[in-house]
Design a protein with these regions (language model features):
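Contiguous surface segments at macromolecular interaction interfaces
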Residues: 1-19, 25-27, 34, 72-77, ...
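Generic detector of short, locally flexible boundary/turn motifs and exposed helical patches
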Residues: 27-30, 45
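Charged, amphipathic alpha-helical segments
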Residues: 36-52
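Short coil-to-beta transition motif at edge beta-strands of beta-rich domains
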Residues: 51-70
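Assembly/interface hotspot detector across virion components, adhesins/toxins, and nucleic-acid enzymes
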Residues: 60, 67, 82, 143-146
Length: 162
């Protein structure tokens, strides 16, 4: 399914106001866990400027955000408006649009750039599709049984809390 069928404002989209953020694990931090844990935890993945201190260098206003589940599958994490670019972090806020789809829409990315995390909308629209829509929002990894536990405290807390 084309992304525009779910996110209808992308039909007439140009690359000037939006960027897509496909968040990927960073060391022991896993974006899908942050998304499942809380809005505040997930917000932390949007304010980070990266090593070059400007992940969204163009004057884009909005971030379509997704968290990597595995491989080339990403789950929708919401839309954020960039309010301020000064300082050590971006100042962003959630946009209520498509709130009911947070944690439910699964995007499959098929582009050649598998290392990047920030993309122009035109690239994502050409190289991605909606693979699935969960009935209920993603709440983290399912408990796999005590004999299979090889998880961090943070992962276990997420399972326990949900």
């Amino acid at each position: 399914m084309k992304i525009q069928q779910i996110f209808n404002e992308l039909v007439d989209l140009n690359d000037t106001n939006y960027r897509f953020h496909l968040a990927k694990p960073s060391g022991e931090y896993i974006p899908s866990e942050a998304l499942a844990y809380s809005k505040e935890s997930w917000l932390g993945w949007q304010v980070y400027k990266g090593n070059n201190k400007n992940r969204f260098p163009y004057p884009v206003k909005y971030i379509f955000s997704f968290a990597q589940l595995s491989g080339n599958e990403f789950i929708f994490g919401g839309i954020f408006e960039i309010l301020d670019r000064e300082g050590e972090e971006y100042e962003v806020k959630y946009i209520d649009k498509y709130d009911e789809l947070i944690g439910r829409v699964i995007l499959t990315y098929t582009g050649a750039n598998t290392r990047g995390t920030v993309f122009r909308p035109s690239h994502i629209l050409e190289n991605s599709e909606i693979n699935e829509i969960y009935k209920v929002p993603y709440k983290g990894e399912k408990f796999c049984g005590i004999e299979n536990i090889n998880h961090t405290y943070y992962q276990l807390k997420l399972i326990y809390d949900n």
